[in-house]
């Protein structure tokens, strides 16, 4: 049986602090088995036993009930993570562009309207050095170039402009997550 990863948004940012051991315990208490995490940012690896949409709702409910805040869950297969890594349009574009730490895949709840992405790219063209590109499989690529902390392209702004929820992971994290997903059981 394969594995999926659930990217939980809003974990260990702002005031939403959760120890991964507590998250795993909450998921085990809710009936999930063979749960593991990668890094401290809400990357949960589970057996591929559930419908992704149903799994997302259940995970969001557990976080809300156990930890008292809303989190969006984006469930993806190993193939989708591999595609998000391989399809990175900014890879290898020089030392200031395409760095694995600076390029993020933003996993979206739905494929956004391409015209909304085009409008966002055009609007931001003169405001910063970041670059955006729409991928397939509900992924938006964002090269932060000079770092996330100095960017105006916050997750809230992206969600508002694109009309869907999303949570981001950098390429370094995605490679670690994929390696963990592909480990023998």
Name these PLM-found stretches:
Residues 2-41, 45-185:
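Surface-exposed, charge/polar-rich loops and edge strands
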């Amino acid at each position: 049986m394969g594995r999926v990863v659930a990217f939980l948004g809003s974990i260990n940012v702002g005031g939403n602090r959760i120890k991964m051991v507590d998250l795993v315990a909450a998921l085990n208490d809710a009936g999930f088995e063979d749960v593991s995490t990668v890094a401290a940012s809400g990357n949960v690896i589970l057996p591929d036993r559930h419908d992704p949409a149903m799994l997302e709702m259940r995970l969001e409910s557990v976080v809300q009930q156990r930890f008292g805040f809303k989190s969006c869950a984006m469930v993806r297969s190993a193939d989708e993570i591999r595609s998000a890594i391989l399809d990175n349009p900014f890879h290898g574009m020089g030392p200031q562009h395409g760095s694995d730490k600076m390029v993020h895949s933003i996993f979206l709840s739905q494929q956004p309207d391409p015209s909304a992405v085009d409008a966002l790219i055009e609007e931001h063209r003169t405001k910063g050095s970041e670059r955006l590109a729409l991928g397939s499989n509900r992924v938006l690529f964002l090269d932060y170039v000079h770092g996330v902390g100095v960017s105006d392209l916050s997750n809230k702004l992206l969600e508002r402009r694109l009309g869907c929820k999303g949570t981001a992971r950098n390429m370094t994290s995605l490679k670690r997550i994929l390696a963990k997903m592909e480990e023998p059981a």
